Design a protein with these regions (language model features):
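N-terminal strand-loop element at the rim of the active site
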Residues: 3-47, 147-152, 160, 218-219
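Nucleotide-activated donor-binding/catalytic signature segment of Leloir-type glycosyltransferases, i.e.
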Residues: 224-254, 259
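Nucleotide-sugar-dependent
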Residues: 192, 246-253, 260-281, 292-300
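Glycosyltransferase donor-sugar binding loop
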Residues: 185, 211-225
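A charged, aromatic-enriched C-terminal amphipathic alpha-helix characteristic of glycosyltransferases
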Residues: 168, 313-320, 327-356
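Carbohydrate-associated surface elements
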Residues: 139, 164
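Membrane-proximal helix-turn-helix segments that form the acceptor-binding/catalytic region
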Residues: 54-61, 77, 81-85, 98-99, ...
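Conserved donor-binding/catalytic core segment of Leloir-type glycosyltransferases
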Residues: 134, 165-167, 174-192, 197-202, ...
Length: 356
């Protein structure tokens, strides 16, 4: 928009709960209601996404835009279709390795491995047609690589633009409180991560245990809520669980916690391949340290910027130690969305100039 272009967002409203057409600060949002479609890696999810892709392609072929911006791999089909049929260039913004989700529930499954492999090959083949590729992480040392290095390994050049919050950030209120709270704020998709948090809290001496605070929706949200409420009713731990929240509510949620739990099961391949959890940056922006996975890029970033502590996955002693260590930290996020905006403009400038 800053370059004088009109922007329309084509969004899949999976639960059909928002207006189908809306204008948000000059950006037109078109939402597609195609029946309720669950999140996750189910057949219904795949069918819903395919239906969304076909609808968007039909819409854009009727009135082609000057540029298509593909937000993650499940929209690449749209970009390639417009390029092949109308010579419209597209940008690929990759902030996840979508194919890794297929194997998450059953990593030993040969069928899931075959499906994941096919998705990976298809994504890479389509990505090679993009005018520009933007991705959300890049290595900061030879030790742990990010998505940019993963793409380079497959012959695709990319520009790193991390997903960091927008300043200014309010000061964290200083309050006198009894006890402390560990939070998991965001999409609740990884039940294994929540189970690790619960087991770790169980392993801590009762008089030192933190309260658990969960906020967010996702495929595992309902089961997590049921399990935690059963534990609370049995008097075994203290916890509070709430569902989806608006971005405007995030500061108040972060003000409730002392440490952010940002660990994920390594069975999700993208953790070891360079994913950077947005919740780690969001928490640091409000003065909250995070506990993250050891032995990968997120640990290097957390240590380099002084915004968190790494812990070994499934090692209760290591996780508990990191929670206590993080609790005593004072953090401040120095690198924000300001830097990422400059990176994004530099990456997109050639393609935007070509549209003039």
């Amino acid at each position: 928009m800053e370059a004088g272009h009109e922007v329309t967002v084509h969004a899949f409203d999976r639960l059909a709960e928002h207006p189908m057409s809306e204008n948000h600060h000059g950006v037109r949002i078109m939402r597609y209601h195609l029946g309720k479609t669950p999140y996750g890696g189910t057949l219904r999810t795949y069918q819903g996404i395919r239906s969304f892709q076909r609808q968007v392609v039909r819409t854009l072929l009727h009135d082609p835009p000057a540029l298509v911006y593909c937000h993650d791999a499940d929209t690449l089909r749209v970009g390639v279709a417009l390029q092949q049929q109308r010579s419209v260039p597209f940008v690929f913004d990759m902030h996840d390795l979508q194919h890794t989700w297929v194997r998450y529930q059953a990593p030993q499954s040969r069928l899931r491995a075959a499906v994941a492999g096919r998705m990976k090959r298809r994504m890479l083949n389509r990505a090679k047609h993009a005018r520009v590729v933007v991705t959300s992480s890049g290595g900061i040392s030879p030790t742990s690589r990010g998505f940019s290095e993963w793409l380079a390994h497959h012959g695709i050049e990319s520009h790193v633009v991390e997903n960091r919050p927008e300043p200014p950030f309010p000061s964290r209120p200083s309050t006198e409180s009894v006890g402390w709270t560990v939070g998991f704020v965001g999409r609740v998709r990884d039940r294994k991560a929540i189970d690790l948090l619960i087991k770790t809290v169980d392993s801590i001496q009762p008089h030192e245990r933190p309260t658990i605070r969960i906020a967010g929706d996702g495929v595992a949200a309902a089961s997590v809520r049921r399990h935690l409420m059963e534990r609370v009713e049995a008097g075994e731990l203290e916890a509070e669980v709430t569902g989806a929240f608006a971005q405007a509510e995030l500061p108040d949620l972060l003000a409730e916690i002392d440490v952010m739990f940002a660990m994920y099961s390594p069975l999700r391949g993208n953790i070891l391949q360079g994913a950077l959890p947005v919740k780690m940056f969001d928490a640091a922006a409000y003065g909250v340290p995070s506990v993250v996975n050891q032995g990968c890029l997120m640990a290097e970033v957390a240590l380099a910027e002084g915004i968190g502590c790494p812990a070994e996955w499934n090692d209760l002693t290591s996780v508990a130690k990191a929670l206590f260590q993080a609790r005593s930290m004072s953090v401040r996020l120095e690198t924000t969305a300001d830097r990422e905006r400059r990176r994004w403009r530099k990456a997109l400038l050639p393609v935007l100039d070509s549209l003039q």
